């Protein structure tokens, strides 16, 4: 599994290089949902506070999910990658949010809403020398852009 091997390599690199290049990596406590299908964007636009159609692929998008009274029930970070949308959101709300999104799917819409909590991880790397760590993991720091996801 790519995420597990990347995480193991990240821990190894941080452990061996932390004296020379102090950085910190956090494995974020979050829930991850993958939405795919012909009508995925339609279902999300019906439920979220933004129109995700106005953003290009690989754009980093943030939005909210509100209940019928207008109260915020979850916050999302989106990654539109290939033919699927990855939602990173509150760890405690994962199952409830997926149920709510699923309830908003019409009988004639083609959408899969998948639990990816144990498949994908959200890792945050911080520190003055984080570019050195990224390079050792095979990521070219010059390819990183604010507001965009990078596949590697």
Task: Mark where each language-model region is.
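Basic, glycine/lysine-rich polyanion-binding surfaces/domains
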Residues: 2-152
